[in-house]
Amino acid sequence: MFGRTYYCGDITEKAIGESVTLKGWVQKRRDLGGLIFIDLRDRTGIVQVVFNPDVSKEALAIAEGIRNEYVLDIQGKVVAREEGTVNPNLKTGAIEIHADGVNVLNAAKTPPFAISDQAEEVSEDVRLKHRYLDLRRPAMFQTMQLRHNVTKAVRSFLDENGFLDIETPILTGSTPEGARDYLVPSRVHEGEFYALPQSPQLFKQLLMVSGIERYYQIARCFRDEDLRADRQPEFTQIDIEMSFMSQEDIMSLAEEMMAKVMRETKGEELQLPLPRMTYDEAMNKYGSDKPDTRFDMLLTDVSDIVKDTEFKVFSSAVANGGVVKAINVKGGAGDYSRKDIDALGAFAANYGAKGLAWVKVEADGVKGPIAKFFDEEKQSKLIEALDAAEGDLLLFGADQFEVVAASLGALRLKLGKERGLIDEKLFNFLWVIDWPLLEHDPEEGRFYAAHHPFTMPVREDLELIETAPEDMKAQAYDLVLNGYELGGGSIRIFEKDIQEKMFALLGFSPEEAAEQFGFLLEAFEYGAPPHGGIALGLDRLVMLLAGRTNLRDTIAFPKTASASCLMTEAPGEVSDAQLDELHLSIKKKVKN
């Protein structure tokens, strides 16, 4: 009964005349004047099966009771379809199976939604509650297959380059890595907790101290953080670490790996080396540290042109150490009314902007609410700086650099999508390099690591650690694809004294550093090699390669935006007995 000879989608005209055995699900059933037609589906596709009393009355009798999503074992002969009945939209559309035997392996209830790609119009909550049905859809299977092919290409490449696939602990200690940890109470050690790893960062560095030299892992990671469309509480990363390698060596190897992934999953050849862009350039031109380079509309600094204008919004911003930047919406003058531009201003306000100034370029100069503040010379300079022409709309932001970059950068992306400027078929990879080592929080009066506390400063900047730490650059690099951060890496600190100075800079007392990272500091005393690595988000990579916009579509059993599983109803309550075993009590129950 289980001797399948073909997958449904693999039968071609070459098999005409063969007797075959197929397994699968009923996609559709049609009863037409004594004949019953069934579209049989498996993971490869669909084939039409015909039940004809002239071939087998017994098979026809069974087929009369079959419904959608029944699981069948079918025997029959491959026959060419009659002229006029060929389906050019189906891979198997030139043939059909004349059934001479059928076994119902399992019956099925009517599913809550049709098993087709049109089901994407159904509520996502319904699909997630019945995820095992959702995964039957061709688009979902293709995404799962793409994910498999990506990891297969990654494993193959790293294996060919001498890497060892080594697992690191899932139950580990809690360390401050940015997001909140998921904590696991210990039954044996009363009042103590494990943490699920936010990344294998410390373990992979310790593997370098161990002399492994080349490590990788398709690693599960966990972060208890606020969610959004491209984040999940549990996620998978391609985790890589190497000893005795420079930043350029690691970037070169990572992009060669991505070239193999693109070649084997999308049939595309990446042009190597990938473009490099400094962090400062990305922020200045794109208003983002993960620039989408598939379209122009770059941010242009016009501070020098407008710094002495009588328009106080501009002149005051520059005088107070801020900037004035602008973007040119090509051909946008006639497309946006004053009301439309006000709506763009409201959008920019979400990113801290206090307003959005604008002018439209006409044949005799610029027109708009602030045009009167620009004499002919300033108008000419603005038009030249922004490469503007008649019919263009110029949008201005004036504030501190961070606010202008964030608001105009977000506005650029919004307008790029709305105006159809983005070629969705493009895969624009690039590296963002020369990152600042630290970020300063003026409210708290302290520094935070821009990446993580284990990133090595640029060697030449080490002398600034005591005098001007805010000016230090990091040996760090992010890989960006189409405006998404695929992942990042860095050369790591491997000398105890530098690591201790970094901890101190981040506000750790010597006692706190020893308590939380003492094992790492001690390991560095036993001959730690220079090392570095990179971690790339597998879920996000698959999302982009599949042309999806939501990480949940790339994970077999994802969580919702509120970090719950609708299918298993996790998280859920546990019994008092379980809590007692773990020496826990619930402080206060809050009903949702």
Swiss-Prot record:
Lineage start: Bacteria, Bacillati, Bacillota, Bacilli, Bacillales
Gene3D superfamilies found in the cross-reference section: Bira Bifunctional Protein, Domain 2, GAD-like domain, Nucleic acid-binding proteins
Enzyme Commission code: 6.1.1.23
Binding residues annotated for L-aspartate, in chain numbering: 177, 223, 451, 492
Protein name per UniProt: Aspartate--tRNA(Asp/Asn) ligase
GO cellular component, one term: cytoplasm
Residues making up the signal peptide according to the UniProt record: none
Gene Ontology terms, MF aspect: aspartate-tRNA ligase activity; aspartate-tRNA(Asn) ligase activity; ATP binding; catalytic activity, acting on a protein; nucleic acid binding; transferase activity
Originating organism: Bacillus subtilis (strain 168)
Binding site for ATP: 223-225, 232, 485, 537-540
Keywords from the named record: Aminoacyl-tRNA synthetase, ATP-binding, Cytoplasm, Ligase, Nucleotide-binding, Protein biosynthesis
Superkingdom per UniProt: Bacteria
Assembly information from the UniProt record: Homodimer.
Keyword Ligase annotated: yes
Site, as annotated: Important for tRNA non-discrimination: 84
Subcellular location(s) of the protein: Cytoplasm
SUPFAM superfamilies attached to this UniProt entry: Class II aaRS and biotin synthetases, GAD domain-like, Nucleic acid-binding proteins
GO BP of this protein: aspartyl-tRNA aminoacylation
Residues covered by region (Aspartate): 201-204
Alphabetized InterPro entries for the sequence: Aa-tRNA-synt_II (IPR004364), aa-tRNA-synth_II (IPR006195), aa-tRNA-synth_II/BPL/LPL (IPR045864), Asp-tRNA-ligase_1 (IPR004524), Asp-tRNA-ligase_1_N (IPR047089), Asp/Asn-tRNA-synth_IIb (IPR002312), AspRS_core (IPR047090), GAD-like_sf (IPR004115)
Entry annotated with the keyword Protein biosynthesis: yes
Catalysed reaction equations from the record: tRNA(Asx) + L-aspartate + ATP = L-aspartyl-tRNA(Asx) + AMP + diphosphate
Homology family: Belongs to the class-II aminoacyl-tRNA synthetase family. Type 1 subfamily.
Gene designation per UniProt: aspS
Membrane-spanning ranges: none
Alphabetical list of PANTHER family matching this protein: ASPARTATE--TRNA LIGASE, MITOCHONDRIAL, ASPARTYL/LYSYL-TRNA SYNTHETASE
Main function: Aspartyl-tRNA synthetase with relaxed tRNA specificity since it is able to aspartylate not only its cognate tRNA(Asp) but also tRNA(Asn). Reaction proceeds in two steps: L-aspartate is first activated by ATP to form Asp-AMP and then transferred to the acceptor end of tRNA(Asp/Asn).
